[in-house]
Amino acid sequence: PYRRQRQMCIRDRINEIYLCKVKQSALTKAGKPYDTLILQDKTGTLDAKIWEPGSVGIDEFDSLDYIAVMGDITSFQGNLQLNVKRVRKVQEGEYDPKDYLPVSDKDIDQMYEELKGLVASIKEVHLKKLLESFFVEDADFEKRFKFHSAAKTVHHGFVGGLLEHSLSVAKHCDYFAGCYPMLNRDLLITAAIFHDIGKLEELSTFPENDYTDDGQLLGHIIIGTEMVGDRIRTIPDFPKGLASELKHCILAHHGELEFGSPKKPALPEALALSFADNIDAKMET
């Protein structure tokens, strides 16, 4: 029953239930009120407008409500937009929440097994123990990591997005390690798997998928470095220099200060990770 936005055409009549991700009121240049909506189902999001809020057939609802919408597809500045004619808030039982979350096209359990295969390939005992403490021995962490997105909107902003992105970056890094023998593969792969772990605390879970207070104040790079540092302290005799190198790779993975990294890459592994991260983010968008 779901049509992706790219499959919709101008003048199509839409009669569907959506999650209202965002609802904002505004005024036209003439001073007339209207509502801007972002509607979501598992295929993605759709911009919508209610040009006559409060009119007959336009019921009251808020952001994060599930709503039944009837309207027509139009075009605005080259993008499809839904002109809403009727809307009502639906009741529980009329919808299944999981149908309204964008989900990775790839098999989530299969991706996680592939990620655990990379964990198993790590030879350095302290790095392997650190990875296993999260990805093998912590069932709650596994559930969260499989479900979470990698971003609010920029890239991999869907259920399984964090896992898909982390695995892809780690695979790029595995390739780099095979091409360039000077790279420490164990350090690079470990950093790749961990690089966006802070997204678990930076972004709230679906359906909100929005920035938390810590996300706004600290950001995922600092949060992730702290998460890894806290766990390192539970592992006996973890080499101090290795811990610093791993944390540096996480801190520097955006590559440049203006892109949000508090440090620029000072290790070849940090540089390789920043390239792998940038490639995967750009290719997904």
Task: Describe the residue ranges of each PLM region.
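Extended, charge-rich, solvent-exposed interface segments
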Residues: N79-F147, I223
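Divalent metal-coordination and catalytic microenvironments
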Residues: Y18, L64, V169, I250, ...
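Short, acidic/hydrophobic/Gly-rich beta-strand patch recurrent on exposed beta strands
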Residues: T36-D41
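Single conserved hydrophobic/aromatic residue that forms the stacking wall/gate
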Residues: P1-R6, I10
